[in-house]
Amino acid sequence: MNKPEIFNKAAHPGASASTGAPYGRNYELNVKLPEQVLVAVEETAAELESLRKAQLIKLSRPVLTIARFQAREEMEATLLRWINRILGSQSGFRFAFNNYGSMPGTPLYWRIQDAEPFRKLTDSFRVLEGWLLGNGCKGLELFSHPRLHLLDEVDGSIEREVLLAFSASTYYEVVELMELQLLARECWEDEYRLVSRFSLLPEGFKQTSFDQ
């Protein structure tokens, strides 16, 4: 695999590969979730709607993220080619959401039962780390054990009540991962936009050559 080019950083004073200066677009690489999962997220949000109106919680975006990073606009074409080459040898796989979880800083989420396939998938993206840093961008943030966050924030006055309510709840859904979606937003924007979709090979299919 050829090493991607280093882009000229002269127009961005203060950029440094060693410090990972935070500028450029914010990118996310997310799993395309099936409709039944998105509906289940909406149903969970509906249960929490009264609390949200009271500003006691902040709902999460319904995404399953495996990578985050920053890159400049002029890097995007090379970035897309690079991701296409990485995923060109990756097969899709099945995984299961398995009940609710909670931990400090992550009030409520759906757990993934076996994250090993995600570890292998995210490891394949580590090759991008040097390219991003070499272009003066922040490093790559990979999520080898991703979670589907349901709440970003919960007020301390109701945190115990919310967690107890969902501790008795169950959720189980098997999902086939066949597509990843690259989203981006400018640093001054709140909403992400879809940049590109990447299809994975059929489950169990192995491509014999990376370069054609």
Which sequence ranges carry the predicted segments?
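Basic, often amphipathic N-terminal segments
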Residues: 1-94, 115-176, 191-212
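Short hydrophobic/aromatic beta-strand or adjacent loop that forms the aromatic wall/cage
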Residues: 28, 107, 179
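A short, structured active-site edge motif that brings together acidic residues
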Residues: 94-101
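Short, basic/glycine-rich phosphate-binding loops at helix/coil junctions
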Residues: 101-108
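Short beta-strand segments and strand-loop junctions that repeat across beta-rich extracellular domains
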Residues: 178-187
